[in-house]
Amino acid sequence: MSLVCYESSSSGEDDDETISDNPRMLKVPKLQESFHELYKKKPKTFDSPEFHEGRIRGQKHIEGLWFVQTYLEVDLSKKVKKGIREFLNSQSRFQSLLCSEHNVPRRLHLSISENYRINYSTKNQLVHKWEQYTNNLNYRTLKFRLGKMCLLFNDEKTRMFLAFECKFSDENYKDLISHASDCMKEFTNRNLREDFLLHISFASSLTNEDEYQNWVSQDRESHFFKTMNEIINTKIQKDQFSESFIVDSLKLSIGHLIFTFPFCK
């Protein structure tokens, strides 16, 4: 017994009928050009402060161009870190770079080149150049010590840094910097700036163009100049910062990728 009553398919009288009475489907009108422009794929940027610890990027991050940083990673001793913290506690303008915004300890960087951008498709070429170079070095380590304190500004004049100048104990570092400069020249057609300074930044603060001008002009009537001058000339216990540091590898950061090249002999 069937649950549903229906006529047998073999007994239908309308088998030869064709369905031709359906109304013709109307075409959807084309969208206006402004709509296509609205959703047109554009270069992605990652300039929101949430990507940069609350800071606004001075230079836009454009899709396909990857940020390059070449540096020596420095693990400061407990004594030096303690000295830095004590020094920073004596003022309120600068924030320590020894920890992230989430209070995660991090190592500091001694940059051996300016930061620059390369096309993503050329990143393997840059990595290969550093592999070849570090595999043919005639030394295993570089030794340096901290020099005097200085105040530095980024190119956009939006941030300033407290830093220690770095003094190397031999001449090997010069060839390393020369190679880094050659890489930047090859991939960006830019030369290393003449005032490039080997340094380790340990604290930062927001700033602006007016403060930068007050500093470079050494405007002694400026409250900002007098305050910053007092900070970098603060008498600190030199024995806390007199240690020598040894590094045995180079770091190359390309976008979110980090490559380590040990110094081989």
From Swiss-Prot:
An annotated GO BP: U6 snRNA 3'-end processing
MF (Gene Ontology): 3'-5'-RNA exonuclease activity; lyase activity; poly(U)-specific exoribonuclease activity, producing 3' uridine cyclic phosphate ends
Keywords noted in UniProt: Hydrolase, Lyase, Nuclease, Nucleus
Compartments where found: Nucleus
Chain residues that bind AMP: 109-111, 195-201
Keyword Nucleus: yes
Catalytic residues identified in the record: 109 (proton acceptor), 199 (proton donor)
Entry annotated with the keyword Nuclease: yes
Organism: Schizosaccharomyces pombe (strain 972 / ATCC 24843)
Top-level taxonomic group: Eukaryota
The enzyme's E.C. designation: 4.6.1.-
PANTHER family for this protein: U6 SNRNA PHOSPHODIESTERASE 1
Main location (coarse class): nucleus
Residues involved in UMP binding: 197-201
Disulphides: none
Family statement drawn from the similarity comment of this UniProt entry: Belongs to the 2H phosphoesterase superfamily. USB1 family.
Disruption phenotype: Deletion of mpn1 decreases cell population growth at low temperature and leads to a generalized pre-mRNA splicing defect, decrease of mature U6 snRNA levels, abnormal U6 snRNA 3'-end processing, decrease levels of U4/U6 di-snRNPs.
Gene Ontology annotations for the cellular component aspect, listed alphabetically: nucleus
UniProt-listed InterPro entries: Usb1
Pfam families for this protein: HVSL
HAMAP family: USB1
Region described as Disordered: spans on this chain: 1-22
Protein's recorded name: U6 snRNA phosphodiesterase 1
Role noted for this protein: 3'-5' RNA exonuclease that trims the 3' end of oligo(U) tracts of the pre-U6 small nuclear RNA (snRNA) molecule, leading to the formation of a U6 snRNA 3' end-terminated with a 2',3'-cyclic phosphate.d. Participates in the U6 snRNA 3' end processing that prevents U6 snRNA degradation.
